[in-house]
Amino acid sequence: PEAEKHLPQRQGYIVTGNPVRPEILAADRAAARARLGVRPGQLCLLSFGGSLGAQTINEAVAALMAWHVPEGKLHHIHATGRYGVELLPRLLREKGVAYENNPNLDIREYIHDMPDCLAAADLVIARAGAITLAELTAVGRASVLIPSPNVAENHQYHNAMVLANHKAAVVIEEKDLTGEKLVAAVKEMTADPEKLREIGLAAKALGVPNACGHITDELLDLYKTHRK
C-alpha cells in the first residue's frame, strides 16, 4: 500500500502483494534444519547479498563470523556471491577464524535451496528487494536489512523502512554498515529469543502469502467484466 503515494494519483489501484513460490511456504522447518546440520535449539543465521555478492556485506559478515564462531552457539549460512568467493575466506583467514570444516558455518557462492534455508533460519541478513521482503514476510522471519543504494530512486531503502516502521526488521544503510554495527545488531537480536520471535511475528503480519491467488482472482474478474 505504501507504494501508492509514489504512483500517479488516480483510482483503480489494487494491492495484491508479490507472489511467493509455493516451495517457500511449504518448506518444513524441522526437516530443513536437520538437513542443513543445525543443532536442536541452535539459532540459525542466513545471510546473502545477491548473486554477484556485495563487498561491504562480505566484509561485515566476516566480522560477524569472527564474533560468533569462537563460541559456536550460532549456525550461519552465508552466500558470498560470485565476487566474494575468494574475498570472504581471505578475510576470515586474516581474522583467524577457523572456518574450514566448521560444522557451524555453511559458506557457499549461491543459495540453490532457499526454501530450506529460509525455513531453518531464525534471523536473515539481506538486501531489501521486493521479492526478498515478500518471502521474509510470508514466512515471518526477523531480519537485518541492508538496502542496496545502487537501485532506481533508492527504492530498497523505502522497502526496508516499511518493515522497520512496523518493528518487523532492523535497517542498516550501506553507507553506515560496518562489522561492528552488524555484530551489535545481531548480538542484540539473538540475545533475546522472545524479542526475535516478536520481530518475526511483526514481519508475518505484513506478509501476503496468497498474493498469487489475489492476482489470479483480479485477472479473472477483469476477464469476466470485459467478456460481457
Listing of model-derived features with the role each one plays in the protein:
Residues 208-228:
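C-terminal alpha-helical cap of glycosyltransferases
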Residues 31, 38-124, 157-161, 165, ...:
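Donor-nucleotide binding loops and adjacent catalytic segments primarily
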Residues 1-30:
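Active-site-proximal region of nucleotide-activated glycan assembly enzymes
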Residues 178-191, 220:
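Two-component system phosphotransfer/interaction surface
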Residues 1-9, 132-133, 153-160:
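Short, glycine/polar-rich helix-capping loops at beta-to-alpha or helix-loop-helix junctions
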Residues 195-209:
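A short, well-ordered alpha-helix in the C-terminal region of glycosyltransferases
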Residues 111-155:
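A donor-sugar binding/catalytic signature common to diverse glycosyltransferases
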Residues 1-2, 17-18, 146-149, 172-176:
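Short beta->alpha connector loops at strand-helix junctions that form conserved
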